[in-house]
Amino acid sequence: MKHYNIYTNNEEGLGTFTDERGTITDIFYKAGINHACLITNAVGAVRGNHYHKHTTQYTYILTGSLMYYSRLVDSDMETEEFLAKKGDVIISQPNEIHAMKTTEDGCTFIAFAEGPRGGEDYETDTYRVESIILGDHE
């Protein structure tokens, strides 16, 4: 898992441009996005517990927060966890299991995909797994 915050990290080559009309803040730069969707979660909602063989997924947090979990497929590594909040972008590469659990009411995020994801392609590159969320199996 890789992540950055659009308001505090400039290492991604992102820019912020301000004039009398307001501000434009880059979320991505030189990314080949094939799909984007807006997702709203209730408190405690769980999403994910899957991976994609060919798709890179970007999750951009608009409001609220959620715990983001990731681990490589067929790996003995421990699950990584990260508290994602407004402005954070989390990148899940192919063959990286990812899951999320909402911690605040009204968590809204946009999921972007490089690869098949929406319309007729929905779930064609999604492989479900048992929960990787820490504490779910205790």
Positions of the model-derived regions?
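A generic "binding-loop/recognition-motif" signal
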Residues: 20, 54, 96-97, 105
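Glycine- and acidic-residue-biased ligand/ion/polar-headgroup-sensing regions
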Residues: 54-73
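Double-stranded beta-helix
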Residues: 7-12, 99-138
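Short acidic-glycine-tyrosine-enriched beta hairpin
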Residues: 73-94
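Short beta-strand His + acidic residue motifs that chelate non-heme Fe in jelly-roll/DSBH
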Residues: 24, 49, 68-69, 92, ...
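Conserved short histidine dyad/triad with adjacent acidic residue
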Residues: 37-55
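A short, N-terminal "cap"/entry segment at the start of jelly-roll beta-barrel domains
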Residues: 1-34
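His/acidic/aromatic-lined binding-pocket segments of jelly-roll/cupin-type domains
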Residues: 50, 56-61, 82, 89-90, ...
